[in-house]
């Protein structure tokens, strides 16, 4: 399947072709919450509009798209460390979106446990430098994806041994560790859960107390209950240490478990895959008809004979320029529009009507849940939409 735009959390990449098919021809095309620019990318390929405007209140988004089209990343080879990421993410859009977890522009893409391995893989593939792999005890000059797929046990064993010795400062019997690993992980999970429960009891606290302390709603149930159990993140764990009796450092109690879970896809190097997406954008043309803006959606002047597309932040999830998005203000703005306005969302007020819906799997969800993505227009534009579609036939 062709990929559109650049890697971005919540990207409409998988739905771009279906969504753009809904739009009638017009002179101008506005993508007011452009994000990863997947919709604009598809619209440019279809070439049914004379002028294109990409806008996002986060200036990094439209800039990254245009930089990619202009070939800025043709010779990009940098390895971005965790420290580099947090120093550069606010000023370097490539770093922010191609080196962040889930392409969210906020958190570094690799856990601390797997970062040394990913760095070694990057050096081997990009710089043909195998010295870091040699440090792990992996003696090879072939770190292709295929070689790694064919030698997973050897690599895991040597990397775990290196990590435990050099990072955890622990000597482990790796062969013994690998026996019945699934059962060991399951048993260890229960021991970790019991460790958290004991800390709660020693402190005379209840899960609801933890929720109040963390400012969460029911998350404590995942830490102390059996249903959908999960261990706190390092940040949350270290915060909990100030509230309940959790004596062991995070790395000691969970470091090995996190390492084992991180090693499931050794051959993958997500940063290079993201870079390849950017490089493919160089083939786009019609740049002279593409305008970049960085404003609030309601500050954009919409010209006559236009199509407006809005992929708004969903309620209870994303922020808008680090602020809560005012959905009511947006709904009122839509009702005033005279040019056709299309909105992607799961639900909208009764003044809007759904013109299409698509089954969509959210890969960023811990449950990989299927959702129904809908495209709406304001009800007062329904007759206009039908007329414009008829004119295109």
Describe the predicted segments one by one.
Residues 46, 50-287:
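Class I S-adenosyl-L-methionine-dependent methyltransferase module
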Residues 188, 192-196, 200-207, 214, ...:
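Extended, basic/helix-rich recognition subdomains
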Residues 321-393:
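Long, positively charged, glycine-interspersed low-complexity recognition regions
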Residues 1-24:
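Class I SAM-dependent methyltransferase Rossmann-like catalytic core
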Residues 6-14, 231, 291, 321-325:
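Conserved phosphate-coordination/catalytic loops
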Residues 258-259, 280-292, 333-342:
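A structural motif corresponding to the C-terminal end of an alpha-helix
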Residues 13, 19, 29-43, 54-59, ...:
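Conserved proline-anchored active-site loop of SAM-dependent methyltransferases
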Residues 57, 65, 69, 288-299, ...:
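Adenosine-cofactor binding site in Rossmann-like domains, unifying the SAM/SAH pocket
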């Amino acid at each position: 399947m062709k990929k559109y735009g650049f890697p971005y959390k919540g990207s409409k990449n998988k739905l771009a072709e279906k969504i753009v098919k809904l739009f009638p021809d017009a002179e101008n095309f506005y993508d007011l919450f452009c994000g990863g620019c997947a919709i604009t990318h598809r619209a440019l390929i279809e070439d049914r509009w004379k002028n294109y405007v990409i806008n996002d209140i986060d200036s990094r988004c439209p800039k990254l798209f245009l930089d990619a089209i202009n070939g800025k990343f043709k010779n990009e080879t940098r390895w971005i460390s965790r420290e580099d990421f947090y120093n550069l993410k606010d000023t370097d859009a490539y770093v922010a979106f191609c080196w962040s977890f889930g392409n969210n522009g906020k958190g570094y893409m690799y856990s601390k446990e797997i970062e040394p391995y990913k760095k070694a893989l990057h050096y081997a593939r990009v710089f043909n430098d195998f010295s870091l792999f040699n440090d792990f005890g992996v003696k090879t000059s072939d770190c292709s994806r295929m070689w790694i797929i064919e030698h997973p046990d050897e690599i895991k064993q040597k990397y775990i041994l290196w990590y435990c010795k050099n990072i955890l400062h622990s000597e482990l019997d790796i062969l013994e560790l690998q026996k019945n690993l699934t059962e060991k992980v399951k048993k260890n999970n229960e021991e970790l859960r019991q460790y958290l429960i004991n800390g709660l009891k020693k402190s005379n606290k209840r899960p609801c107390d933890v929720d109040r302390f963390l400012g969460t709603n029911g998350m404590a149930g995942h830490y102390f209950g059996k249903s959908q159990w999960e261990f706190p993140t390092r940040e949350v764990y270290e915060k909990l240490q100030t509230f309940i009796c959790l004596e062991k450092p995070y790395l000691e109690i969970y470091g090995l478990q996190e390492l084992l879970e991180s090693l499931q896809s050794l051959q993958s190097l997500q940063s290079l895959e993201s870079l390849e997406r950017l490089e493919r954008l160089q083939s786009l043309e019609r740049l002279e008809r593409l305008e970049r803006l960085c404003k609030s959606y309601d500050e954009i002047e919409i010209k006559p004979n236009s199509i407006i597309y809005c992929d708004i932040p969903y309620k209870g999830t994303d922020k808008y320029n680090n602020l809560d998005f005012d959905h009511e203000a947006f709904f009122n703005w839509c009702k005033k529009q005279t040019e056709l306005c299309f909105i992607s969302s799961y639900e909208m007020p009764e003044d809007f009507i759904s013109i299409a819906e698509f089954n969509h799997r959210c890969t960023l969800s811990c449950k990989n849940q299927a959702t129904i993505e809908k495209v709406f227009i304001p009800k007062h534009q329904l007759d206009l939409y039908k007329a414009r579609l008829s004119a295109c036939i």
